[in-house]
Amino acid sequence: NANADTDRAAQPFKTTAEKTGIHILSVVSGGMRCFTCKGHEIRVPADANGLTFRVMDSPIYIKMVEALSANAVPMAGSEMYVAMQNGVVDGHENTIPNILQDKTYEVQNWICMDEHIPSTSAVYSNEAL
């Protein structure tokens, strides 16, 4: 990632290493997050109005869904499939790799490829390694 190669992007990594001894070796892409839904096609933001989405228990994800005039239900990922299967929530937002891994496509029939948030992971190491 070209952005991660700049001094400005590297500074938080250096600060973390200095304060904690934990070195961030790499940041990798986990894909872009998209909305899925059962029985409701989402093409424009207004299509999400009144729907209920499972989200991670994170204020930014909750506010994002609420900004669509939809309802956010913070829920563990392990509960997501059954919640969608039983109609507790209309859908969720996740990356394509996670949608495939969790097989949520079995209980969802629409995906909105809006790519609203990039999902990243980091590789860490302590100084001993």
Predicted regions mapped to residue ranges:
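Cys/His-rich zinc-coordinating modules
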Residues: A4
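Core domains of carbohydrate- and sulfate-ester-processing enzymes
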Residues: D7-A9
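N-terminal secretory/targeting leader peptides
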Residues: N1, Q11, T15-L129
